[in-house]
Amino acid sequence: MSALCFYFQVHQPYRLRHYTFFDIGVDSFYEDEDANCGIMLKVARKCYLPMNALLLKLIRKYDGRFKVSFSISGTALDQFEAYAPEVIQSFRELVATGCVELLSETYNHSLAFLYSPEEFREQVA
């Protein structure tokens, strides 16, 4: 069997709620908690949990002859912890096989460079 290593980047952004001019000074909650929860539960059920179960099955079937790497953003980890902790457990089970490596990842995927070079430098420094 040829050497094979899969790399998966795991990221879940926070969803923003509709925020109008009239909300300024009245409501400072920018994130849509219902959307964050609903989307996380859906992608956990349809994507993360089935894929991690499949990878675990294949690692066992092929006796660890391939490797998998994950980089998981901080926003994804925060949402897994809040809404779908079983996803974190599924990653732990994969890491325990010795065939899975966790790589460094940024907390979020900022677009600050589009608006402010100074802010971008602050975030990556």
Predicted features, each with a name:
Residues 68, 72-125:
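Metal-dependent polysaccharide deacetylase catalytic core of the NodB/CE4 family, i.e.
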